[in-house]
Structures are given as structure tokens and as C-alpha cells.
Curated annotation (Swiss-Prot):
Belongs to the universal ribosomal protein uL22 family. One of its GO terms (molecular function) is structural constituent of ribosome. It comes from Myxococcus xanthus (strain DK1622). This is Large ribosomal subunit protein uL22. CDD domains: Ribosomal_L22. The gene is rplV. Part of the 50S ribosomal subunit. GO terms for cellular component: cytosolic large ribosomal subunit.
Amino acid sequence: MESTAHLRFLRMSPRKISTVAELIRGKPVEAALNILKFTKRAAAKPVEKLIKSAVANATDKSKGQVDVDTLYVKTISVDQGPTQRRFMPRAMGRATPIKKKTAHVHVVLAEAKK
């Protein structure tokens, strides 16, 4: 059985989130949460929260029949979201653009074969 969770419009660069996602791809859920707990990256907190949400979705979807210890991170993908454009005033009446990037993160958890 598979369970999914999505985090959309996260106000962080997809490149920075991808480094955290690579750490936990293919790992058991318990190990992934432990890795994220001790990772000193800003992206670790929202990804940890997302995995906990996917675990809650799995238990709710199966009405409590799923064993959380058998779940692993099957896929985790980080996609680019829309960029927010802001402008910073500069000298002589000019302005330069600032691009505030967003990201979409999708997690799929699956049960390991016994």
C-alpha cells in the first residue's frame, strides 16, 4: 500500500531542498526522520513535517492496519514552483529584480516486502 503527501509553494529554493531529499530517498521512515532530526539545514524541518503527514495519511487510509515500522520512502521529488518577483531600488532611479523561489515537494511512502 502506498501513501502520499504534498507540500506546495514552500518558500525555499528547490536546489536547497533537493540536497535534503537525497539524504532520505529509499530509507525506512524511522531512519529518515532520525536523519532529518539531526540535519542542520532549513529544509529539513518542512520535509520532516511532510513525512510525518504521509505516515498519518497511511495509517488513516488503512484504518490503522499498516505497520509504521515497515514503511519506507519510495519516492521524494522536488519541483520548482512559481517565482515571486520583487524589485530592489538602486542608485540613479534604477531597480533590480529579486526572484523569490518556491518549491513543490511530493513524498510517496510504501510498505516494504516481508
